[in-house]
């Protein structure tokens, strides 16, 4: 099954997440199909905290991809 989930990056105590479309059987930071956005929970000032490619997310959900709980919350908050 294909899932859209977060892959952690960044430094110690300074997380940065990429929203990845990947096969559920692959590791979280392993092989992926496509990157559809990013989430920076520690964004300050002019930094962009969240960017989502909603067209690609809708495409993958239409193809049967599942959203992880955290990604579903981010998508819901971004679409307000």
UniProtKB/Swiss-Prot annotation:
Q: Give the highest taxon in the source lineage.
A: Bacteria
Instruction: Give the matching Pfam families.
Output: Ribosomal_S16
- Its signal peptide is none
PROSITE patterns for this protein:
RIBOSOMAL_S16 (PS00732)
What are the GO MF terms of this UniProt record? structural constituent of ribosome
Its GO biological process terms?
Answer: translation
Give any Gene Ontology cellular component.
small ribosomal subunit
Swiss-Prot/TrEMBL keywords: Ribonucleoprotein, Ribosomal protein
UniProt lists the family membership as follows: Belongs to the bacterial ribosomal protein bS16 family.
Protein name per its UniProtKB record: Small ribosomal subunit protein bS16
Instruction: Give the species.
Output: Hydrogenovibrio crunogenus (strain DSM 25203 / XCL-2)
């Amino acid at each position: 099954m294909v899932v859209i989930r977060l892959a952690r990056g960044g430094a110690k105590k300074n997380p940065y997440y990429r929203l990845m479309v990947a096969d559920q059987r692959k590791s979280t930071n392993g092989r992926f199909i496509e990157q559809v956005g990013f989430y920076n929970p520690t964004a300050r000032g002019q930094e962009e905290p969240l960017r989502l490619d909603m067209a690609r997310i809708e495409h993958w959900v239409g193809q049967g991809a599942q959203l992880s709980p955290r990604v579903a919350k981010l998508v819901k908050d971004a679409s307000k």
